[in-house]
Amino acid sequence: MVRTDGHTLSEKRNYQVTNSMFGASRKKFVEGVDSDYHDENMYYSQSSMFPHRSEKDMLASPSTSGQLSQFGASLYGQQSALGLPMRGMSNNTPQLNRSLSQGTQLPSHVTPTTGVPTMSLHTPPSPSRGILPMNPRNMMNHSQVGQGIGIPSRTNSMSSSGLGSPNRSSPSIICMPKQQPSRQPFTVNSMSGFGMNRNQAFGMNNSLSSNIFNGTDGSENVTGLDLSDFPALADRNRREGSGNPTPLINPLAGRAPYVGMVTKPANEQSQDFSIHNEDFPALPGSSYKDPTSSNDDSKSNLNTSGKTTSSTDGPKFPGDKSSTTQNNNQQKKGIQVLPDGRVTNIPQGMVTDQFGMIGLLTFIRAAETDPGMVHLALGSDLTTLGLNLNSPENLYPKFASPWASSPCRPQDIDFHVPSEYLTNIHIRDKLAAIKLGRYGEDLLFYLYYMNGGDVLQLLAAVELFNRDWRYHKEERVWITRAPGMEPTMKTNTYERGTYYFFDCLNWRKVAKEFHLEYDKLEERPHLPSTFNYNPAQQAF
């Protein structure tokens, strides 16, 4: 940048537009010296951009080629050197030329064909670190200028906008000020200093924003709201805008725009937001096929008959006739139960008798018409049987089954004996009575402990009582006096002596000194006088 060490701070702030914005220092630029933006003179003050100082008309430059050209003529004027047609904001060219030429008073030897003058742009370190070539081919169209005026280029490449540095973080044409509190940001109002009123500058700002977000070359006239607030509608303006029939070549063409580049592939960038193609997964009943999809998509269609079916009429809804017919055809592929009870469409390999699924299905369908078969097919609801379901006791003493009027007997619960084997009816009166007196004590104890709750246990207890064995209710054992030993003490209520206890766990008799109270002994079991035990008689 141009050093003005001899001037005061107020004079520095009153430099002309070109002297504040584009100050020339070709030596630093040609030698490739990098700068990290430490020089504050490269930043301009927006409030003092355009005041005119007649005594500061001419600016000394290190080289004659570093003189600034007429800004309006080179950027917005008749670009005859490039051979490119006028476009965009050409109607504002005289005003731009007039306002800029009055404020700059450039030397006469600088012509529009000279191109964009050499400007000392402070760029970050680039891989090449070389000399930036400046020639007429680096002339910019007005849309590229718009990308450089305070708006970061989408490609961040100065070479694509006319002044280029291959570094992505290079600044644009007009250097933007740093984010400092004392600096004023570049706004739309400052654009009026270039010969445009505020409305024209606002329209230009919108068009520049549209170019940046849409990736176009500025060939359409877009006005209204800033598209950065509506990124989802960015692609729609490509079709709705009125384009120039002969647009200039856009250096950003072919690049994917930032808006929607993550969620949309490159081949769908020109499509509007619509659902004419199924953007959402279809319902199971839909067999719609996207014409842009490959033929392999037909493999994912559900088809029970083994044939691939597709429809180009769109998805079918349940109310359509075709879908109803298709559903009926699919239902006929399963097992069908006719009203007369016959079963058709039985798959191969399925059991067809009454013991398989076909028999169960037939039985259930028959139970729907015959209420008497509900208990056989589906079972009974226990809450309707009048039983106490919270009782921990067994149900069989009181409830046999829903069809039985009396409880089951114990011998009829565990198993069922065919009538051919029930011979006790014929021989019950011919069998001799059992005489337990013939058996020893060991067998009697076996009958007592192994036939709990049976009459045989009661008969064995009677026989043991007859043999001077007594059952102690507290000790729950059988005791008897030791043979040949009298009690050492005997009263009307108790006695003391040596007794034999029968140990059922070790199956033996154990002698023990014991104080016996008579009221704790079990009485003799009571049996009918005419009772003559015969196990065969207890079969029924």
Curated annotation (Swiss-Prot):
List the GO terms this entry assigns under cellular component, sorted alphabetically. Answer: CCR4-NOT complex; CCR4-NOT core complex; cytoplasm; cytosol; membrane; nucleoplasm; nucleus; P-body
> Segment Repressor domain: which positions?
437-540
Q: Which residues form the signal peptide?
A: none
Expression across tissues is: Ubiquitous. Highly expressed in brain, heart, thymus, spleen, kidney, liver, small intestine, placenta, lung and peripheral blood leukocytes.
Q: GO molecular-function annotation terms? A: transcription coregulator activity; transcription corepressor binding
Q: Which UniProt keywords apply?
A: Cytoplasm, Developmental protein, Disease variant, Intellectual disability, Nucleus, Phosphoprotein, Repressor, RNA-mediated gene silencing, Transcription, Transcription regulation, Translation regulation
Q: Where is this region: Disordered?
A: 96-126, 276-342
Q: Where in the cell is it found?
A: Cytoplasm; Nucleus
Q: Where is the composition biased (Polar residues)?
A: 96-123, 289-313, 321-333
GO BP annotations of the record are: negative regulation of intracellular estrogen receptor signaling pathway; negative regulation of transcription by RNA polymerase II; nuclear-transcribed mRNA poly(A) tail shortening; positive regulation of cytoplasmic mRNA processing body assembly; regulation of stem cell population maintenance; regulation of transcription by RNA polymerase II; regulation of translation; regulatory ncRNA-mediated gene silencing
Q: Which residues carry this modification: Phosphothreonine?
A: 93
Name the PANTHER family on file. Answer: CCR4 NOT-RELATED (PTHR23326)
- Disease the record associates with this protein: Intellectual developmental disorder with nasal speech, dysmorphic facies, and variable skeletal anomalies: An autosomal dominant disorder characterized by delayed development, speech delay with nasal speech, and characteristic facial features including upslanted palpebral fissures, anteverted nares, a thin upper lip, and micrognathia. Some patients may have skeletal anomalies, such as brachydactyly, toe syndactyly and flat feet.
What is the recorded name of this protein?
A: CCR4-NOT transcription complex subunit 2
* Taxonomic source organism: Homo sapiens
What gene does the UniProt entry assign to this protein?
Answer: CNOT2
